[in-house]
Amino acid sequence: MNIDLNADLGEGCASDSELLTLVSSANIACGFHAGDAQTMLTCVREALKNGVAIGAHPSFPDRDNFGRTAMVLPPETVYAQTLYQIGALGAIVQAQGGVMRHVKPHGMLYNQAAKDPHLAQAIAKAVHDYDPSLILVGLAGSELIRAGERHRLVTRQEVFADRGYQADGSLVPRMQPGALIHDEEQALAQTLDMVQAGRVKSVTGVWTTVTAQTVCIHGDGEYALAFARRLRAAFNARNIHVIA
């Protein structure tokens, strides 16, 4: 079987270049929560060198809190901001002779769009209007995935190696206990369950069905690089091929 392995990059982490040798897709910060024109250019060049699929990682305008602040913005504003960020990265990718493949929202924009159909609609419309061939990445089973499908976009349902899940398939909010998985063995077991069995055990002990088409490794995690190597080895041992 095949699985896509993605990481959020261009966010100021020293491990970006090494992670790009292990993942199949890169979600590059577009300046609203982290990064700038230079980091975008650097990440694009490194991704192209390693044959990694390139995607935009748009966010709410929130550099002070790394895009993790909840915001209530009109859908038209979210549409414009998303389009702006996709376009910025797209210009850099095109100038370097590459092709942008996907869009994955960041942080609170991602989380709110997973539940808010109006926000999800604004993001999906921005992606479609920029380039309807782009893939929209969102939380498995979320409103964002449904919005992408309504716009006839190709979607990729995402699961997280290092995040706790609630019984409804949503992520445990970062400020709550169980939101982050720090134990590598637990994260590895959870990932294999999601990829191979299509299920995840919630923090309440309930097993929930989940569709895993792409697995996220957070590039800003303390052990991201070591865990990425372990996960690749585990996939190889089970004849799971990492491919975008």
From Swiss-Prot:
Biological process according to GO: carbohydrate metabolic process
What Enzyme Commission number does this protein have? 3.5.2.9
- Name of one Pfam family that matches: LamB_YcsF
- Domain of life (superkingdom): Bacteria
Reaction catalysis annotation: 5-oxo-L-proline + ATP + 2 H2O = L-glutamate + ADP + phosphate + H(+)
**What keywords are assigned to this protein?**
ATP-binding, Hydrolase, Nucleotide-binding
**EC top class, in one word?**
hydrolase
Task: Share what the entry says about its subunit structure, partners included.
Answer: Forms a complex composed of PxpA, PxpB and PxpC.
Which PANTHER family does the record cross-reference, listed alphabetically? Answer: 5-OXOPROLINASE SUBUNIT A, UNCHARACTERIZED PROTEIN YBGL-RELATED
Give the protein's recorded name: 5-oxoprolinase subunit A
Write down the species: Salmonella typhimurium (strain LT2 / SGSC1412 / ATCC 700720)
